[in-house]
A protein has these predicted regions:
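Small beta-barrel nucleic-acid-binding modules, primarily SNase/OB-fold domains
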Residues: 1-161
Length: 161
């Protein structure tokens, strides 16, 4: 009888240990923000779908003063992510072999957040999903909507010439 109690206690202790190891895993992500709409997550290059942000070297004008809007878009994304885990829903691969995805922090779409902050645009050519967010930022003159700017696709086109 005494031996059976020892076995039962040992089995219960072992089961509890396994349970805690499985359900209390420390999550770790290798994450780097590349620019306003691209991240590297665990070795995978991910481009956010449905939005476009200014290029890192792109500037805007606010009351005649240059504003580093491309750098700000990256900073806003970096600050939003903070130390939180990022979860992405893949939507395919683009011609540059990047994963196309919508990514979330605490169940909030990073794309929606960036567009509503005024430092990203709904990329209507590919999706209309974030148009309401863009309308909100534009109407309220948030972020780049309070400045003079070139759309990122126009900026890139002008740099090719």
């Amino acid at each position: 009888m005494f031996l059976n109690k020892k076995k039962i206690i040992l089995v219960i202790s072992f089961s509890l240990l396994i349970f805690f190891l499985i359900f209390n895993q420390v999550k770790s992500q290798d994450l780097r923000v590349v620019d306003g709409d691209t991240i590297h997550l665990n070795g995978e290059k991910i481009r956010f779908t449905g939005i476009d942000t200014p290029e890192l070297k792109q500037t805007c004008l606010k009351e005649g003063v240059k504003d580093p809007c491309g750098v700000k878009a990256k900073q806003i994304l970096n600050n939003k992510i903070g130390n939180n885990d990022v979860e992405c829903i893949s939507e395919g691969i683009d011609q540059y072999k990047r994963t196309l995805a919508e990514c979330f922090v605490n169940n909030e779409s990073l794309s929606s957040y960036l567009v509503r902050s005024g430092y990203a645009f709904a990329y209507r050519r590919y999706s209309k999903k974030f148009v309401p967010d863009e309308d909100y930022a534009r109407i309220n003159k948030i972020g780049m909507w309070s400045m003079e700017f070139d759309y990122p696709w126009d900026y890139r086109k002008s740099k090719k010439n």
